[in-house]
Amino acid sequence: MPIAVGTIQTLGFPPIIAAADAMVKAARVTITQYGLAESAQFFVSVRGPVSEVETAVEAGLKAVAETEGAELINYIVIPNPQENVETVMPIDFTAESEPFRS
């Protein structure tokens, strides 16, 4: 099954927690990474089947738009990332995310 990665980046913490919550509720995806991108900018990444990641990112973007004062910085969905990308960048499933893998 083709696996994708989707990432949303926002200004501030409240919109990213809203996005993360909406993403895992809307689709069969697993949060693989969350963190501080730079000054007050946060990101969340999910993995799962391509169509599920697309659905999750759409739901996350909607949640950001509905969060008062939220600012979307950027987002992306990458279907079937190359093995080299998975190996070098921290987008793969981790020991923490594996129990929640769909």
UniProtKB/Swiss-Prot annotation:
It is found in: Carboxysome. The keyword DNA damage does not apply. Keywords: Bacterial microcompartment, Carbon dioxide fixation, Carboxysome, Photosynthesis. It holds the Pfam family BMC. Disruption phenotype: Single deletion has a wild-type phenotype, a double ccmK3-ccmK4 deletion has slightly larger, aggregated instead of spatially separated carboxysomes, and has a photosynthetic affinity for inorganic carbon between wild-type and carboxysome-less strains. In another study single mutant is wild-type, double ccmK3-ccmK4 mutant has impaired growth rate; ccmK3 does not complement the double deletion, while ccmK4 does. Residues 4-90 form the BMC domain. One of its GO terms (molecular function) is structural constituent of carboxysome shell. The keyword Protease does not apply. GO terms for biological process: carbon fixation; photosynthesis. Gene3D superfamilies: 3.30.70.1710. Induction: Carboxysome size and components vary with growth conditions. When grown in ambient air at medium light (50 uE meter(-2) second(-1)) there are 15 units of this protein per carboxysome, the numbers are stable under low light and high light, and increase under high CO(2) (at protein level). The CcmK3:CcmK4 ratio of 1:3.8 is stable over all growth conditions. Heterologous expression of 12 carboxysomal genes in E.coli (ccaA, ccmK2, ccmK3, ccmK4, ccmL, ccmM, ccmN, ccmO, ccmP, rbcL, rbcS, rbcX) leads to the formation of bodies that resemble carboxysomes, have densely packed paracrystalline arrays and RuBisCO activity. These structures open the door to generating carboxysomes in plant cells to increase their photosynthesis and productivity, as well as tailoring bacterial microcompartments to specific metabolic needs and molecule delivery. The absence of ccaA, ccmK3, ccmK4, ccmP and rbcX leads to less active RuBisCO. Its main location: other. Coiled coil: none annotated. A non-essential, minor shell protein of the carboxysome, a polyhedral inclusion where RuBisCO (ribulose bisphosphate carboxylase, rbcL-rbcS) is sequestered. Hexamers form sheets that form the facets of the polyhedral carboxysome. In PCC 7942 there are several CcmK paralogs with presumably functional differences. This subunit probably only makes heterohexamers with CcmK4. The CcmK3-CcmK4 heterohexmers have been suggested to cap other hexamers, perhaps to alter metabolite flux. Interacts stably with CcmK4, probably forms heterohexamers with a 1:2 CcmK3:CcmK4 stoichiometry. Bulky residues in the pore region probably preclude the formation of homohexamers by this subunit. This is Carboxysome shell protein CcmK3. It comes from Synechococcus elongatus (strain ATCC 33912 / PCC 7942 / FACHB-805) (Anacystis nidulans R2). The lineage of its organism: Bacteria, Bacillati, Cyanobacteriota, Cyanophyceae, Synechococcales. The gene is ccmK3.
